[in-house]
Amino acid sequence: MRAVHGTLVSGYVGAPGSLKKTECDTLEFAFDGIVGDRHRGFTRAAWDLTDKQPGGTERRNERQWSAVAHEDLAAVSKQLGLPAALRAGDVAVNLSISGVSEFSRLPRGTVLTFEGGVVLIVEEYNPPCSRMSQHIADHYHRVNEEPLGQSDFIEASKFCRGLVGAVEVPGIVSIGEGVMIKQEVLPKWLRA
């Protein structure tokens, strides 16, 4: 497959124990994730309901970073009837990337290569969770001042919540930096 090019619109780092993320002009990626972010680490504890392992089991961390399409955030915000578009940090996501249609549908193994040399690999889709949906309902309202329901965010973002993955090549990325996105169609050993 040919490469698709996008642009990093915004970047965020989240403190441990909080859904809130702080906007940054640059993000430093290490082999174990984004420096200063709560999801940094080579391993993480398994979640009770969504992981294959029993809750609390130490497992490989496939969530060293998270990303969402800038355009998808705007569409979700419009569907929810919000007065302004949600930002990646509002939904606890590290990276907002523009210019890539169907971003959330990129498969495992897709490689994101930033102009400065940082390389990230997609591990899986980042499904919307009830905790984030409740957070959005508690902190945002519709243009007409009507409250949001507990599961409105889940419904609006169920196919466009973004992706999570791991770091392949560390370094620093800056807002406005270009990113080349390439899906791995065939394993190297099958290519002619």
Label every model-predicted segment:
Residues 106, 114, 172-175, 179:
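Short, well-ordered loop/turn sites that connect or cap secondary structure elements
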Residues 1-115, 124, 190-192:
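Electropositive, beta-rich accessory/interaction domains or terminal extensions
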Residues 97-99, 162-171:
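Short alpha-helix capping/helix-loop boundary micro-motifs
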